[in-house]
Amino acid sequence: MTFATDWHRPPRQMNGTSFFYAHTSQWRHEKVGVDEILAPDADGNMSKLSMIDYNAKAERMGWLPSAPQLGENPLDIADQAAAAGIDAAQYVAGRLKDGSLDMACNDPDNPKNFPRNLFVWRSNLLGSSGKGHEYFLKYLLGTQNAVLSDENDEECIKPSEITIRPAAEGKLDLLTVLDFRMSTTCLYGDIVLPTATWYEKDDLNTSDMHPFIHPLSESIQPLWQIKTDWEIYKGFAKKFSELAKDYIGVRKDVVLTPLMHDSPQELGQPFDLKDWKHGECDPIPGKTMPAITVVERDYGAIYEKFTSVGPLLEKVNNNGKGMAWDTKHEVEFLRKLNGVQASGVGKGQPKIETAIDACEMILTLAPETNGHVAKKAWEALGKATGRDHTHLINSSEHTAIRFRDIVAQPRKIVTSPIWSGVESEEVCYNAGYTNVHELIPWRTITGRQQFYQDHKWMRDFGEHLCVYKPAVDFKTTQKLLGKYPNGNKEITLNFLTPHQKWGIHSKDCDIFVS
């Protein structure tokens, strides 16, 4: 549902830390040299790189995702490969090797490579969620900010693996925010779309901190011009499809995917770490660099796909954590429950017209809320372990939670192989329970509880074992003491801010006081 893998695979995803570190140009202000945090016995060449250099290397070697991925439009690259009669993966690898194409992470401030539009949903990115608030304001928004350090300071570490351009300020052309609170991000947004709050919409709610699934249910209709999250995004999809049908149409897209956990790819670089960028090896998709897949996209049909269940759940399967199971029966059930689309690319497929339809799709397909699906998922895991695990859900095999059920009363979920605890009247939920008692391998490369990380970079940075490390001096406060006096004595405080359960997030902001 979230990544539309019922219609297209693989999805294009990104980790927020790498994305915002690069595009808010925080790397320009780094004053801590890598040599200051390396282990004494580290490879001497490691100290020649900066923090952003390591991130760029990790992205191009396939350890991290990238956004954007390549220095050219991936739709155009797909066309070029087709015109040349070459497989897209081979075409991209060849151009990366001869230098005519580069990864976007190697040139983050190229106007072709930095973000222009940002849609923020229910996240206070510019308040407390994004770390480095002042850098977001300066480099993404180009507005008043409190950046106190000078990016041209001679103490700032200069990268050697990426292209350094004059700093771009105000990279974003459009910031759109969906929220029911007037958050800090809303205050800075170009467009704020007021969305329905707790009692104005239908939705699902759960947590990894308790074993129940419960609803948000519409008690009153959204007020004034407010719409629910589902209706807002459905509206986006509809208008975009109307415009894209003529402007973009049907195109093929080259998608890069990192070497994924719970897949054979994570064993693809077992010994020395070789960087194809430096000619240490060839760029081999899925082994020494990200995997490459061509995905056909019909941009004029996005709305029709948004409002219907895609065919891949029947043609391929549903999956998670390296397991896969058949879902034909569940999709057929959704046809009867939600009805079917009468026309378009989703003709004959189950409808997802309303938020409740979407909730029913999730409840029907998830092993946590459908006992029959849970049994198939446990059987799939059993094929890998050689053991029968289905006894874990004998008492709940026929459980099938519907949205109306949780509206009446929150329901306890079914034991699922996606997690490592069990839902039981005799055993409290405890992470790792099935690994110990069902002899299921731990999700590590060795299949065992693993405290030693045998990776060259981890060893070089002294992070191969979890041991005490003193605090790192980031060299950010000393030069500022006395620079902006306010008549009061200045002190520097170092706060420990663990994230307590059931707590608010305000403490993630305003933690440095002077």
Annotate each predicted stretch with a short phrase.
Residues 231-246, 250:
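Non-catalytic, well-ordered alpha-helical segments in soluble enzyme domains
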